[in-house]
């Protein structure tokens, strides 16, 4: 370079970009899951990062775990890359946690031990317990205050905007599949030395208004619900603010009213088990009362090491046969059948006693959602069908008969 010529700093795409303006149409349009990426300057990479614009499971798994899942191994076909699967519960459950509090405890310990500088988690609005507020928690108390799932679309990745200049060099991100797919895609561009990812399994999120419709059509006192979950006993468990619990059988849902309440992003998602996370903490592969954990790589084991001494650990188990129930469910859901409550209760009791349990229940839930979502995609976005459904989901879906139209 000739003497006297100024050295020009080369900026990266996200340094030149700005978050989308409020009220803008998001690139994924109706399929947008509001993950928050476009609410940060990392919107610069949205075409390569958005789970609903570009499916990149194999590349993501290989980058995060060193390999993609083995499609000939049934456990990996369903649950993703893994080093270890187990069930567990905290020996001393966290008061007010959704289950026993394993995810919250890991976040707290990651800060207490100095493993990370901050935890990306989701608090709640002071005005509404179901309105999510993503945050970079710096203290265990902030992580604890964020306990309990928020079953609405949450823009977690908008907090990426806060990273530059924050002093955060090591981050634990807690999130669901669509958020983690985008996060993994932009990971090389983040101002971080280390990123740990604790994933939550996720299906059937809703907008805040959709949640209200669901609660009002399902539960006796919508205004007092603190949290809820679709559980392994084929019932939805609601906890109310007075500490009482209420359960409603899956089969008693008002399907005609609720069929369109779930977000289009969730109806076109095939990342139920959070393929890009280092460690996954949920319940779908465990028996009732326990949580299901999948360690995908050494970082995932490092996260589990933080808390394992505090856990009651047991092997995963599996029993029953899901396939007939899945096939019948495809047809019932497609016809939007609503059963009388007495019949729904009876079917629920029979299925709870004789139906799939443990990993087989997890496969039941995956099969049911993947077949439903394939149908929804075929009917609503046929142009995306071939490229959008990953190979593992195609293999699972091919085991069932879907309506032809």
What is the predicted function of each stretch?
Residues 131-158:
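Glycine-rich phosphate-binding "P-loop"
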Residues 97-130:
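Low-complexity, highly charged intrinsically disordered N-terminal segments
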Residues 2-68, 279:
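Iron-sulfur cluster-binding cysteine motifs and their immediate structural context
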Residues 195-217, 307, 315-329:
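Short, flexible loop segments at boundaries between secondary-structure elements
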Residues 30-52, 176-182, 261-273:
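Local cysteine-cluster metal-coordination motifs and their immediate loop/turn environment
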Residues 99-102, 126, 173-183, 204:
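Gly/Ser/Thr-rich loops at beta-strand to alpha-helix junctions
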Residues 9-11, 49-103, 107-109, 360-382, ...:
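Electropositive, gly/pro-rich neighborhoods at or near active sites that engage anionic ligands
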Residues 116-117, 221-405:
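Long, compositionally biased charged/polar accessory segments in the mid-to-C-terminal portions
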């Amino acid at each position: 370079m000739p003497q006297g010529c100024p050295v020009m700093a080369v900026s990266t795409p996200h340094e030149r970009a700005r978050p989308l303006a409020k009220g803008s149409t998001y690139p994924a349009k109706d399929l947008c899951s509001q993950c928050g990426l476009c609410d940060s300057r990392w919107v610069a990479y949205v075409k390569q990062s958005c789970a609903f614009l570009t499916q990149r499971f194999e590349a993501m798994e290989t980058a995060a775990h060193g390999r993609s899942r083995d499609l000939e191994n049934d456990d990996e076909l369903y649950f993703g890359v893994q080093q270890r699967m187990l069930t567990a519960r905290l020996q001393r459950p966290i008061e007010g946690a959704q289950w026993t509090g394993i995810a919250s405890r890991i976040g707290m310990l990651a800060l207490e031990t100095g493993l990370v500088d901050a935890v990306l988690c989701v608090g709640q609005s002071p005005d509404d317990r179901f309105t999510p507020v993503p945050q970079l928690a710096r203290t265990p108390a902030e992580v604890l205050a964020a306990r309990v799932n928020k079953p609405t679309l949450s823009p977690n990745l908008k907090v990426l905007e806060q990273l530059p200049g924050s002093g955060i060099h090591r981050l634990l991100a807690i999130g669901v599949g669509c958020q983690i797919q985008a996060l993994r895609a932009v990971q090389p561009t983040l101002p971080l030395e280390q990123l740990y990812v604790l994933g939550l399994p996720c299906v059937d999120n809703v907008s805040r208004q959709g949640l209200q419709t669901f609660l009002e059509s399902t539960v006796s006192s919508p205004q007092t619900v603190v949290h809820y979950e679709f559980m392994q006993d084929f019932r939805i468990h609601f906890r109310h603010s007075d500490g009482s619990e209420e359960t409603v059988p899956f089969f008693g849902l008002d399907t005609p009213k609720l069929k369109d309440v779930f977000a289009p992003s969730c109806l076109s998602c095939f990342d139920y088990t959070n393929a890009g996370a280092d460690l996954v903490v949920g319940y779908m592969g465990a028996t009732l009362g326990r949580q299901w954990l999948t360690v995908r790589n050494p970082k995932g084991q490092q996260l589990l090491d933080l808390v394992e001494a505090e856990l009651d650990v047991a092997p995963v188990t599996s029993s029953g046969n899901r396939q007939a129930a899945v096939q019948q469910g495809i047809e019932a859901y497609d016809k939007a059948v609503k059963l009388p409550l007495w019949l729904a209760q009876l079917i629920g009791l029979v299925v709870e006693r004789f139906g799939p349990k443990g990993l087989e229940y997890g496969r039941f839930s995956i099969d049911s959602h993947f077949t439903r979502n394939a149908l929804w995609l075929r009917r609503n976005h046929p142009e995306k069908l071939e490229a959008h459904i990953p190979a593992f989901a195609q293999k699972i879906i091919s085991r069932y008969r879907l309506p032809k139209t």
